[in-house]
From Swiss-Prot:
It comes from Xenopus laevis (African clawed frog). It comes from the Eukaryota. This is Abasic site processing protein HMCES. The modification Thiazolidine linkage to a ring-opened DNA abasic site is found at residue 2. The lineage of its organism: Eukaryota, Metazoa, Chordata, Craniata, Vertebrata. One of its GO terms (molecular function) is peptidase activity.
Amino acid sequence: MCGRTACTLAPDDVSKACSYQDKQGRQKCPKWRDGDTDKYQPSYNKSPQSNNPVLLSLKHFQKDADSSERVLAAMRWGLIPSWFNELDPSKMQYKTNNCRSDTITEKALYKAPLFKGRRCVVLADGFYEWKRQDGEKQPYYIYFPQIKSEKFPEEQDMMDWNGQRLLTMAGLFDCWEPPSGGEPLYSYTVITVDSSKTMNCIHDRMPAILDGDEAIRKWLDFGEVSTQDALKLIHPIENITYHPVSTVVNNSRNNSTECIAAVILTQKKGPALSASSKKMLEWLQNKSPKKEESRSIIQSPKLSQFGAPPKKTSAGLMQQWLKKEDGEPSPKRAKK
């Protein structure tokens, strides 16, 4: 399952984080589709029906473009099929935020866009999953293992992204045109697979994550890579890490740094943390721990318990984790 994500990077940083090499070996950052940066709002707590950054082939919008060229678009989470004939897309009766890989070639909802080559990569800092234990549900934040950088986001060149590695999930999209006319609605679904060994202790399903640019290239390039070959990329992966977070994330209206901040479970034992997660907990613990009765919320001293929602120019808590010096406050930049 994948029903809640965090995506806190500003639009320009999303583009930098998605840089790739084209067929000529040139490093490129995909551009946003015109007008879509205004549709995307960074958030620590994004739920279905929100607009989120999606990577896809430019050829879907420009027929003369090479299918290997990429573009960023803001799409609605929850696929609305092109054949939907209601005036209001919110009247869609089926939940389409996820699509099971084992039925993707059978259900008409997903079969049509799949065989039309409407493959996309859904971008996020990470996603949330809830573990059921003793009648309760404990949320976990799941993401790619991060490599800390010596550079600050403000110091990076356009083609030299050293910030957080975005989670890249395989998805399908479709385009619905209102029967009464108006702007077409682009929407997507996240493909899910059986959980890997790493994830199985939390949930039995996980998003189909594309690990590495070669997998992303093959999934997006519908002109060169057949549907059959593309589906071979859809499988569980082990290269993920996670940590428990506060139940404040349970309410989708909550949008603060507390949603992704690591907590230490003190009463009930959760799944064993990975090495990367343990390092992150140690880093956060060196900051300013705040104890509660049943768990401890660990946050940076610069972040209040209910920190402000991410701005389109903010780096967020995960970016602080990527700084080189553990336990040291981020140095202030000199005013020009």
